[in-house]
Amino acid sequence: MESCNCIEPQWPADELLMKYQYISDFFIAIAYFSIPLELIYFVKKSAVFPYRWVLVQFGAFIVLCGATHLINLWTFNMHSKTVEIVMTTAKIMTAVVSCATALMLVHIIPDLLSVKTRELFLKNKAAELDREMGLIRTQEETGRHVRMLTHEIRSTLDRHTILKTTLVELGRTLALEECALWMPTRTGLELQLSYTLRQQNPVGFTVPIHLPVINQVFSSNHAIKISPNSPIARLRPIAGKYMPGEVVGVRVPLLHLSNFQINDWPELSTKRYALMVLMLPSDSARQWHVHELELVEVVADQVAVALSHAAILEESMRARDLLMEQNVALDMARREAETAIRARNDFLAVMNHEMRTPMHAIIALSSLLQETELTPEQRLMVETVLKSSNLLATLINDVLDLSRLEDGSLQLDIGTFNLHALLREVHNLIKPIASVKKLCISLNVATDLPEYAVGDEKRLVQIILNVVGNAVKFSKEGNISITAFVAKSESLRDPRAPDFFPICGENQFYLRVQVKDSGLGINPQDIPRLFTKFAQTQPVATKNSGGSGLGLAICKRFVNLMEGHIWIDSEGPGKGCTATFVVKLGIPERSSEPKLLLMPKVPANHGQTNFSGLKVLLLDDNGVSRAVTRGLLAHLGCDVTTVSSSDELLRVVSQDYKVVFMDVCMPEVDGFEIAVRIHEKFMTRHERPLIVALTGNIDQVTKDNCTRVGMEGVVLKPVSIDKMRNVLSNLLEHRVLFEAI
């Protein structure tokens, strides 16, 4: 016993207790050894773990604790010194690792607590995101409903369809019990129930617009909850209902349509609104949500826009229908006017032909009588007859010109002519007449005025003759001056003619002709009437003046055709007057001789006057006119053969005849076709006779047709002996006669 190294236990031995401690230490050791294994397993399975060294220390601490318990199993009995040393070493190591782990946990535990805090924060954030996602889903659903409702509302532009569709779609989308629209009356003092969803209330019911609940809704941009008992919310019978559904009202702006007058639209001098009322189902706990109210507000704005578009479309359709009616009426009036113009032109053409035929006889025979031996009294009577006949012919020409000017059928005959020679010719024509009245007439032509010009020579002469003729006619004594010069651009504009906008292009100029006289003068207030057809002022319409009052009216229209302006100035009766006109003419690219244009001339002393033996063939269906024309030609020495039909003419015509006069406006006979057949009958131009149209109608169509079929000229009835002499002289000299009137 003395050699035994066993340590005597300090405590009394109790076998049972020892057994339990032994077993407990064994299982504690097993648990301590299994815990690190589990930690190592799960750490390896974890992809991210920031505290690996802590786990190593903690695992070492647990392993050492388990080792102490395991070693402690050998300490319950007698044990050796080695066991004691191992036990002591294990406890020392356990103490060191435990202290190190404890020190490490001082730094780790706050991080672990912050992880928990972050976890709570993330949970709160996730909950907030869930709420936001719910709001986004709600907004998306609201937007989808808005798009659907907007599409349905804008699928039509009929106002009634828009409003009915709005109520139906809102009722279906929001599951409403009732939905209604109150529209303002034309007076703006009441709201009228115009549309309802279920149509159980009579449409047409009105409420005053100044109710507090209506003012409350109209004063807000948002949907407002209103009492179910208010007059505008009593849309459904409430008998048997325990609790009516919530009601909201929203205003619908009626956009101001200042450019449109909608017949059944309220007067919008101030801003007006319609009222939309929406009711949730009764006897339910359902309430209005924010997104539903936003949907209602957006739909109200869309309805306002759609209603404005519908109103504009309705007015546009009304305007279109009105325009169509007006167009139909205008088209009918245009056709009637065209029919009237054609009838007038036909009447004038017939009257022109029928009047010129007897006038041709009067003038021709009177001119023939002038060639005979007459007593002074007889000559005076013949001259009076001839003068009156010429005046009547001029009147007929004026009426026809005015008619063609008014219907736009008269066109200018543009050509190159000698402007200086034209002015001298007018001066020479007027000078003998002025000399009889002891008037001194002078012509002043500016040095910078182009010698040749491009324009209608005949109409320009007609304008100047009319203006100068009036000056001679209404002047008893004194002077008449004619001044012609190029109008400067700064002097073209005239405040009396605000519609006259002179535009001078390249190779163009404005001719200004001014005729000043010391005659009777005119009241300034009467001047505008001078350019009205058939109008004469009191000082002008003197007993001896004569005239139809057409001259200046025709001149004004001719001047307008030439893109010009004409006006008259006078200080009053007895102070004379000044007539001025401006017309646009062209400048020819190179000087060239103007085409031959025969105008009425006084008997000339030069040229051929004896046509003895000249064989002439005359076609005229009118016996009197045929006999008169034959007498004129025979008096000039011509050998005349007369025919009354086209067949006879074609049978008789031959190379022996030098000139053929033919009326191209005979009934049931195409004179132009006869001219073509005459051309076909002869091989060359020198073999066939010269063909001249002798007619009472000399409009542009007739002249164009004469040129087309190859006629050498046109002569307008009536024809005097001097006119016929000039026609034959020029025809035989130049073998062409463009026109003689």
UniProtKB/Swiss-Prot annotation:
Cofactor mode of binding and number, as noted: Binds 1 copper ion per dimer.
The keyword Glycoprotein is annotated on this UniProt entry: no
Domain Histidine kinase intervals: 350-589
PTM: Activation probably requires a transfer of a phosphate group between a His in the transmitter domain and an Asp of the receiver domain.
Primary location recorded for the protein, binned into one broad class: endoplasmic reticulum
Job of this protein: May act early in the ethylene signal transduction pathway, possibly as an ethylene receptor, or as a regulator of the pathway.
UniProt protein name: Ethylene receptor 2
Organism name: Pelargonium hortorum (Common geranium)
